[in-house]
Structure formats: structure tokens, C-alpha cells
Amino acid sequence: MRSDLQVSRLFTDINEPLPKQAELFGFSLSWELDYVNIFDILESWEIPIRAKNRCGKNYPIIFGGGPVFTANPEPFADFFDVILLGDGENLLGYFIEAYKEVRGAEKQVQLKRLSQVPGVYIPSLYEVTYEGTNGAIKSIEPIDKDIPAVLQKQTYRGNSLSASTVVTEKAAWENIFMVEVVRSCPEMCRFCLASYLTLPFRSASLEGSLIPAIAKGLTVTKRLGLLGASVTQHPEFESLLDYLSQSKYDDIRLSIASVRTNTVTEKLAKILANRDTKSITIAIESGSDRLRRIINKKLENEEIIQAAINAKAGGLKGIKFYGMVGLPGEESEDLDATLEMILTLKKAVPGLRLSLGCSTFVPKSHTPFQWFGVNYRSEKRLKFLEKNLRSKGIDFRPESYKWSVIQGLISRGDRRLSF
């Protein structure tokens, strides 16, 4: 907390006192398709959407941060004055300190000063040239010699990670206090933004961060969520489980992010079941060992089956699997392998509720698969899985192919999307 700032937040269910004239107006974006909410909010505040139209009046500086902006800020360049690249723990403070130095200055002076902060990108101070009208980006050059030619995203090296500041029934995860257990992922699947964008893999200190945060959060809610791309690979995860197994936490409901199959033990399943968790989630991507080797998903079908057996033995009622179609190298035989694996699972763990949520591969910047496109065959492949799994009593939940295409445009697009 800083005593030199007055911070107001926008919610759907409560109102905090809002300033008559905001100086800084910030957004954090974790998913490409949330972009529409940004425009809605700006319009509701009668703030012009495009940065070039915010020069005539005393409009706030519009800034953005989070994984979507860090991965590829260019589609948002025409709408934002400032984009913060990387982890915000330290970067946000440096940004505010620089702004205080030029608080009363003209906007162009403010932006030039802010451009000197490592990790701060001012899109209007850079000129983009392309290889022809519809070609690739040829260069992104500063318009002035005093503007940094190269920007470096910022990486937080501490061992105290984030936790919820708001708990509400209106959130995506209703009334859950979320605690970030790890950041990044050591597995390095070739499609995964969470691995490559947020390197290195970091874990929160058990005694210094996790336990104090959990204790505080459980004073306002009885629902706890452990967040991270690879939660069960925290080096002290067993100790964390032991802490949450204490009798004083018998009445809490524990939720956990997607876990790796080789960490699904009967002990883990029992603890989750005793904390009112009905199921766990495992990202398998495909039932094909061959395709998983291509994408560097270090996982075998035997491990998936054993994880399901352990989950049932520990008292869980179901498993949710994440899958993907349209991955580079995917053939029709790989879809058949997914069907076969799911049906084998159904026989191996009768009574365990199985569901498969399946999305279309979307290329992400900074990953080895960033140069692949969205496979136009993906929509038919989703329908193929849907037809053959639902007829066998498997809960199949496909994501919209059309929205995946839009997500891919934002993930790999540039400023021309705003023309």
C-alpha cells in the first residue's frame, strides 16, 4: 500500500469512491477476448478509445499490463498511451514514481519521461514499417533518438507471489480466495504461453507468503483456490497439503488449478475430497503419445490412467481433462487415439465422472509454435470428437472455433487490426 496514491477500482457489484478526474487509468488483461470490456469501460467514462483522440482535453493516461499486453502489445497500440511489459510487482512502482516527476507537464513530456522506465512501452513514440501493405512487420523504430530502441520485459525475482484482493460472488470463480502458488511452468510445452512468457519458474515461500496469505483469506471466505500453471510442482507442495489438512480447516472448500498426472496421488485426492472438492483437472492435450511428444507434453497414457485410479481411490467423483485440436503435426489418427484413451479410462475407473473440455490450438507469441496458424480443420475435428464421445456418455465441452480464430488474430496480430 502507498500513502501517496488514491486508488479506486471498478466492480460490477459494489462501488468505490471514484475520482472526478482520474490521472491514470489502468487495465490488466489475462485473456485476449477480454479486450471488448476495455472499450466498454472507456466509453462509459466518456474517454475516447483511440489514444490520438485523447490529446485535446485533460484525459487520464490509459495504461495496460498483464500477460496479454506483455506477449504482444501491438494490437492495442492505437488505444493505449502506456503498456507495461512483464511482472508488475516492481514495474508498477517505477512507473508511478516516474509519473510523479512529470505529473503537471504536458502529455507528450509525460510520455517521453515514462518511456525511460525499463519495461515501459509508449506505442505512440515508435513507428512501424511493414513489408508491403499486407506483409510482415519490417521494423519498429523510435521516432526520437532519446527513446529506447530496445525494451526489456521486467521479471520479478521475489518469493512472495500474488493473492486475491477482492472476493465476490460476481467473480469468475465465485467467492474464492485465490493464492498464486507458482509462476511459470518447468515443463515447457511448445504451445504454452504460461511457460515461456513468465520464465523463470518461481515458487512462493511457504512460510513467508503462502501460509500468511491463506490465513488472511480464510477470514473472509471458506473457499480457497491454489493458482498456478503447475501448482503441484511447488517444492514444498506436500508441506502445503499437510498445513491445509489441519482440523481447523475442515470446513473449507479447496480448489486447485490443473495438475500433472504424476502428482495425482491418493493422498492428494483424499485431502481434496475431504475439503469438498469433487474433481480435479488435468491438461492432457491429446490421447496420442506421438502428438504429445511433438508438443513436448511429457506424459504417457499409462500415467493418465493411474492418475484417474488414484483420484477415485482418494474419494474424488470426477476428472476434467483439457484437450486441444489443431495442434501442429496432428493427424486423424491422433483424434482416434484420444477417443480410444477416453473410452479406456471409462472402463478403468467405472463410476468416475469424466469430462473433456477441448479448445482449438491458438499460436502464442514467444512460444516455439508461434509461427503456426489456427488450423482450419479444427472446427470439424471438434465436431468429430463431440459426436463420438457424447454418444458414449462422455461429457464433452468444446470451445468456440470462431472465437479461437479471433483470439489468434489478437495473439499474433499487429496495429493493422485497429484500422
Q: Model-found features: residue ranges?
A:
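N-terminal [4Fe-4S]-dependent radical SAM core
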Residues: 123, 129-178
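Conserved SAM/AdoMet-binding glycine-rich loop
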Residues: 33, 210-318, 325-355
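Glycine-rich beta-alpha loop elements in corrinoid/cobalamin-binding modules
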Residues: 11-140, 364-414
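A short beta-strand-loop structural module common to alpha/beta enzyme folds
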Residues: 3-11
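Flexible glycine/acidic-rich beta-alpha junction loops that bind and position SAM and/or redox cofactors
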Residues: 127-131, 235, 267-268, 290-295, ...
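Structured alpha-helical segments in the cores of large, soluble enzyme domains
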Residues: 11-20, 63-65, 69-71, 92, ...
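Short secondary-structure boundary/capping segments
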Residues: 42, 78-80, 99-100, 196, ...
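Canonical Radical SAM [4Fe-4S] cluster-binding loop centered on the CxxxCxxC motif
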Residues: 171-206
